[in-house]
Amino acid sequence: HILDLTAGKTEAAKQISASAFIDACQLLGDAQSQLSGVAMHSATKSYLKKLNLIETERDSTDVEFDTYQGRRVTVDDGCPVGAGGVYTTYLFGNGAVAYGNGSPVGFVATETDRDKQTGAGIDYLINRKAFILHPRGIAYTGAKRDHVETPLRTELAMAENWKPVYESKQLRIVAIKHKIG
């Protein structure tokens, strides 16, 4: 699900706003209540804070956290900023991204090695781990893939390599492409 505000006719229509955020939630229809968090660039958060739209709450253990329209805010400058100052903000639901251990083809998780020529010898125990983050409800097909071992970031970014396997409303990730004032 993508709401691209940058196609707006005026500069104001291209900027993230409270009503645009509601429009993004509406892309999930009656399943929008599943959206529990929002990840945004720090510049986006600062812009929304200037508009007095970010609220700071305190939980029962006295820990403060920010919310936007009732959804917990995660700030990460790794959120994309494209040409012309186009930011991408993500809404997501609990469990929208799966985390697991991977075992790629040819992957050797544990092995030993020995350096016989150093002192009395040095033994090495080598452990490798492969971690996987994957959006739930979308299958990676690898339809356009040149790299043999693992897909490259450019290959992961290609829409042709992904196929939805869940009903559209069950995909609990929404991207908002926008500008800030």
Positions of PLM-derived features:
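Structured, hydrophobic secondary-structure cores that serve as assembly/anchoring elements
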Residues: 1, 18-52
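Long, hydrophobic, well-ordered secondary-structure blocks that form the structural core
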Residues: 1-8
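Sequence/fold signature of self-assembling virion shell proteins
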Residues: 11-16, 23, 49-181
